[in-house]
Amino acid sequence: MQALERDIDINRLEKISIGLASADEIREWSRGEVTKPETINYRTLRPEKDGLFDERIFGPTKDWECYCGKYKRIRFKGIICERCGVEVTRARVRRDRMGHIELAAPVAHVWFVKGVPSRMGYLLDISPKDLDRVLYFASSIVTWVDREGRANDIDRLRQQVEEEIRQIEQDRDEEITAAQALLTKRISVIKGESSPDELTEDYADVPEEEREEAIARARREAEETIEDIKRSMDEQIELIRRAWEEFQTLEPRQIVDDEELFREMKDRFGDEYGYGVYFRGGMGAEAIRDLIRQVDLEKEARELRQVVGESRGQKRQKAIKRLKVVDAFRTSGNKPEWMILDAIPVLPPDLRPMVQLDGGRFATSDLNDLYRRVINRNNRLKRLLDLGAPDVIVNNEKRMLQEAVDALFDNGRRGRAVTGAGNRPLKSLSDMLKGKQGRFRQNLLGKRVDYSGRSVIVVGPQLEMHQCGLPRLMAVELFKPFVMKVLVDRALAPNIRSAKQMVERLRPEVWDVLEDVIKEHPVLLNRAPTLHRLGIQAFEPVLVEGKAIQIHPLVCAAFNADFDGDQMAVHVPLSPEAQAEARILMLSTQNILKPADGFPVAVPSQDMVLGLYYITYAGEDFEEREPKALLASYAEADNAYREGSLRLHDKVILRREGERIETTLGRVLFNESIERTLRGYLGDAYNPAAYRFVNHELKKGEIKQLVQQYVERYPTELVSQLLDTLKHVGFHTATLAGISIGKNDIVVPEQKREILEKYEKLVEEVEEQWEAGFISDEERAERVIGLWTQAKNEVEEAMKANLWKLNPIYMMANSGARGSYSQITQLAGMRGLMTNAKGEIIDEPVKSNFMEGLTVLEYFTSTHGARKGQADTALRTADSGYLTRRLVDVAQDVVIREEDCGTDGYIELPLYLEDGQGDPNDSVAARYLARDLVNPETGEVVAEAGTDITRPLFEAWLEELPRETKVPVRTPTKCENPHGVCQKCYGRSLATNRPVDVGEAVGIIAAQSIGEPGTQLTMRTFHTGGVSGVEDITAGLPRVVELFEARHPKGEAVISDIDGIVSLEETDSERLVRVVVTAPDGSEAREYRVERQLLRPEIVDGAEIRANTPITEGSLYPHQILENDLRYGRGTTATERYLVDEVQKVYRAQGVDIHDKHIEIIVRQMLRKVLVEEPGDTRFLPEQVADRFSVLAENERVEEEGGRPAEFHTILMGITKASLATESFLSAASFQETARVLTDAAIEGKVDNLTGLKENVIIGKLIPAATGLPKYRRLTVTVEGYRADDVDELDIAAS
């Protein structure tokens, strides 16, 4: 324990192991035994001696002061007061000094008893139910039997037993004879024939008339007495016989439920005062510990391996499970008897505090109550043992002690939870670790930090891209130590203390110093929820008045921020390293691209788009119009605009670089602003001829492309300046144009009435056909819905044609600034069809629009969909967050580890998506070619293997290669690096558009890229409108979860398990058809009965199909694809591609772009594990799930030594299971099922090598990624004007 009190350099920790603690270790950790349940004295409010807060055990409550006050001040450091026995030291030792409780009887650790499966039960091969009965004193268990002694002495024992039975029978007969003799005597006394004695005096002097009755009574009593004698003696004989029978077949670990029988056996055959000690047994943890101590782990493991090798079915499964536990104990160095505790540790008091509330009452941690229960029961048990109380009472107290310790370790695991005030279950040690409020997630993975603040955000349109506005009051508080240091350095304050006072009083000098301090000192801004890495970015602060943080309009998209009351947090990077990181890696100008797809995220939106659209707008009749002026330069254009001789949309001809450009004045002014920025940054290097004059309307999409071109062509710094220019021009123009909305801008088309009347007639005709019985109700609904959809489209077209092109509402929608045509249609056209609560379309549309107003019925019809939408959004947010958490957990340790793993594996991606739209497959870009790329038509090599596929190169291929080209590329799923991914398999970093750096945490980025758009996905299951047979097809978020968890899909398709030829056969039922697939060589055939209407069109008689070909419509089951492919030796590629493509389908349906490689990283983690079928000579167990790379490494080792390697096959795991199966127990425990993970890890004596990010965050070490890697940590940073002997701001902050 003393070692724990020394400060450990966390960053030098290499690994952490976990194991079982022996009683001796628990006593070693302890500073003293807690023997009293008292906490603090209610009068003095000081800890009680020997109690749960005792200062002698846990250390002083005040720094450098003993309990009695004899020693005060630091100069007495380390002295132990001879009066009160308290060591003079810091009070913070009360956070790590432990105590212990010596138990009067051993108790079992509830995790190992009641965990599922029961580890103790597996070790002893006792069912959990029986184990429970023994531990809680309901049954007895035999711990040892002297089989040899019993066999040798069996005849003697039989004789002794028979002799005893004979003796009892003889005694019985004698007692019966005596009873009969007494009866005879009583009768003669009643009759007056003899004189009475003591036994017969009640029957003397009976009157004549009552003698008959008295004789009858005497006879009755005699019969009862004889009956009692017979019964008690027979019971005794029966018990002895049963005990003898039981004893003859008694075996160790046998449970005896009958307490009387066990006592009888023990008295006779288990006691030296009986017939001798032939067996031992008992109840409670003591008996179980005796059994555990007898287990020979080596022998048990050998026997179990033999059973596994020889048997099948249930027996083998059980043996495998037992072997896992036995082997864990055998190899870990943990002794199994340590699962039974003789002493329990007491947590340091500051981790279970007791604080006084205002009203003089106390609030205390639940643990104190639980410890008190243990101590009370333990003390009572000690007293009972000292008094020599009967077994029944002692056993009851032992049971209560066991229950108290159970409640302390894991309340509620067995039986009813112990409750406190208000029937609330008390929080036990396990609860302290579990869940969102537990130690792992609340205090280790996420902490509150100093030097941070939060405030409401407002827009700062005057800011530059890399700046943010920080309120003065916030800044002075955040940079306090820095300001104090400079005040002292400049001799504005004599010492740190007075500098602190100056800052607190906000003296005028402070503001000047603050300006200098924050110059070039970036701060981090964060908006919750931080869904991807762009949710935290660095900015240079600019001091602003007021109390709101100002942020640049272009970073809003990355933060998903708006100004309706959002708040953001500010954090100050303190050390020079942290500042350098913030400036170089996290500055907002470095985060223009979105890591999910590599496209710009800092793109002008809303007002800026409107302004840019307006300034580049030319009008429909641009071609026909005559130019109003010929301009020789940008300067002329400026003058003409200022004078008012030309307007923004006037057509002009500009002479530029020797060419005449027909354009508008607005476009000339726009291009001038851009060129001015370029010239200002590039200076003499600027080549105007290379600049492409923008001569088209700028809508949202075009602006995005423009930014994309800037990113590809110019350095980051210039890109941010160009973005600022776009922002300025956009806001400026939008303001000057004065675009706003008025009621009269919503123009209802005159043709609307005619269109509606036309369609009402058509609908009427359909209704008549239905009434006449020509069509079914489903057909009617389908046709009516089709007609009304057409009607809405026609009204929309009429409305578009009707709107003036400079109508503000039209411009907003057309430019992509805000809103959409569908919204304008609802305002000015018709709302159209609505859905009901089930998600089905109501066939009566809303014919009105919002301008005209809805009827009551129409309004009612609209409410269903609107409310469902609201509920949906709320559910979706929670589900999406949980999905992100699971994704992060499964991929958190995937880091770029090396340059090239040298794998031959690759995949072929089509140049265009095969989704019917025929869009380019963006996921080909940002990778490396794995083989030469050959033009399939000409056969020429277009690019060589190893080529870095940049965006421009990919776009060039789209133009020159035929559509059906397949591109062979490297992929993370085929990477052979055992601990992460290599640069070549990953490709380019989408966030920086450069080859990815070694150390980049690509797993986290992948998880964020998939999780962040999760909230945009729908929740709904699509209903097929009553078509029978086809199950509801899941879409949206539930479908993504279904795929990543590798579950059976809803609406699963029937697939062929083998390669073969199809033959279709009729069945008795009209609905069903029999599909038989026969292998080409006729060796096997598979039969599937499927619904006729679900049969896929390509499944026809004689068709040749491969395994995994779907026979019916629906989604495939990924496990089945993998199983079939492995049977044919086809590897995992088909499974990987199915998962990636299906996830992509969901995201593309919502218009979300994600690069395939992110999904591939997650899929790689799902397929990392293998199932060991036959362990050979390796250290693995049969049917053990292990990491593929560790099995391969072990096989290599065994083969070198000439042994047999393990046989295994890949398995697919859902992300939750894969996270729990990770090598790191810290990571798994902080994810889910904390108690189970820690139980298993402790038994196995697991070692956490701290390779992932999570486990390092938990122990407070720098993460082994990016700048946390050793090669980056050895860099030294020199700062100008920073002297080595300066007092550091960090020292000031610490003091």
UniProtKB/Swiss-Prot annotation:
Its cofactor is Mg(2+); Zn(2+). Keywords: DNA-directed RNA polymerase, Magnesium, Metal-binding, Nucleotidyltransferase, Transcription, Transferase, Zinc. GO terms for cellular component: DNA-directed RNA polymerase complex. PANTHER family: DNA-DIRECTED RNA POLYMERASE, DNA-DIRECTED RNA POLYMERASE SUBUNIT BETA. This is DNA-directed RNA polymerase subunit beta'. It catalyses: RNA(n) + a ribonucleoside 5'-triphosphate = RNA(n+1) + diphosphate. One of its GO terms (biological process) is DNA-templated transcription.
